[in-house]
């Protein structure tokens, strides 16, 4: 018999952040590595342009997206990876997603104060 009133799960918002983090990591972080790892050291990108971009509102948004979403993805993977390896942390979801939330708030304050 199918339960007519299924219990709601708290997973959809976490899966949203996880999916966004995986997408951001796959698409945009290689570009960041190219800019910071190759173009900047060889002088093909001016440091002052990067700093000016970082202080603009769109730059702050980019910094937020490139730091917050991959952290959610990573902590979600660690949480479920430990579960798959039968390492059950008491209140693991609370710990890992709590750390991700604390990190998110910390990054928000740091970027807003740029």
Curated annotation (Swiss-Prot):
Cellular location(s): Cell inner membrane
CDD domains in alphabetical order: QFR_TypeD_subunitD
Gene3D superfamilies reported for this sequence: Fumarate reductase/succinate dehydrogenase, transmembrane subunit
Record field: transmembrane: 24-44, 50-70, 92-112
Any one cellular-component term (Gene Ontology): fumarate reductase complex
Record's bilayer topology term: Multi-pass membrane protein
Protein name: Fumarate reductase subunit D
């Amino acid at each position: 018999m199918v339960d007519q009133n299924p219990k709601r799960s708290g997973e959809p918002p976490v899966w949203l952040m996880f999916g966004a983090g995986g997408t951001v990591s796959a698409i945009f972080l290689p570009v960041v590595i190219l800019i910071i790892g190759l173009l900047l050291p060889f002088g093909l990108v001016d440091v002052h342009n990067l700093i000016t971009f970082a202080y603009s509102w769109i730059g702050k948004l980019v910094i937020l997206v490139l730091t917050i979403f991959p952290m959610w993805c990573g902590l979600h993977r660690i949480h479920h990876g430990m579960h798959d390896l039968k390492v059950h942390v008491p209140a693991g979801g609370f710990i890992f997603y709590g750390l991700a939330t604390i990190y998110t708030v910390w990054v928000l304050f740091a970027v807003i104060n740029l």
